[in-house]
């Protein structure tokens, strides 16, 4: 997962 807004479309928590 990627809990950072910088991840763009990959954002997930």
UniProtKB/Swiss-Prot annotation:
Q: Which GO MF term does the entry hold, naming one? A: acetylcholine receptor inhibitor activity
- Cysteine amide sites (modified residues): 13
The organs and tissues expressing this protein are described as: Expressed by the venom duct.
Keyword Amino-acid biosynthesis applies: no
* Keyword Iron-sulfur tagged: no
Task: Spell out the subcellular localization from the entry.
Answer: Secreted
An annotated GO cellular component = extracellular region
What S-S linkages are listed for this chain? 2-7, 3-13
Q: Which UniProt keywords apply?
A: Acetylcholine receptor inhibiting toxin, Amidation, Disulfide bond, Neurotoxin, Postsynaptic neurotoxin, Secreted, Toxin
**What is the protein's known function?**
Alpha-conotoxins act on postsynaptic membranes, they bind to the nicotinic acetylcholine receptors (nAChR) and thus inhibit them. Is active on muscle nAChR. On mice muscle receptors, its higher affinity site is the alpha/delta nAChR subunit interface. On Torpedo receptors, it does not distinguish between alpha/delta and alpha/gamma acetylcholine-binding sites. In vivo, causes paralysis followed by death when injected into goldfish. In contrast, has no effect on mice, when similar doses are intraperitoneally or intracerebrally injected.
The record's domain comment reads: The cysteine framework is I (CC-C-C). Alpha3/5 pattern.
Q: What else is known?
A: The primary structure of the mature peptide is identical to that of Alpha-conotoxin SI from Conus striatus (AC P15471), with the hypothesis that the first residue is an Ile.
The family this protein is said to belong to: Belongs to the conotoxin A superfamily.
By what name is this protein known?
Alpha-conotoxin OIB
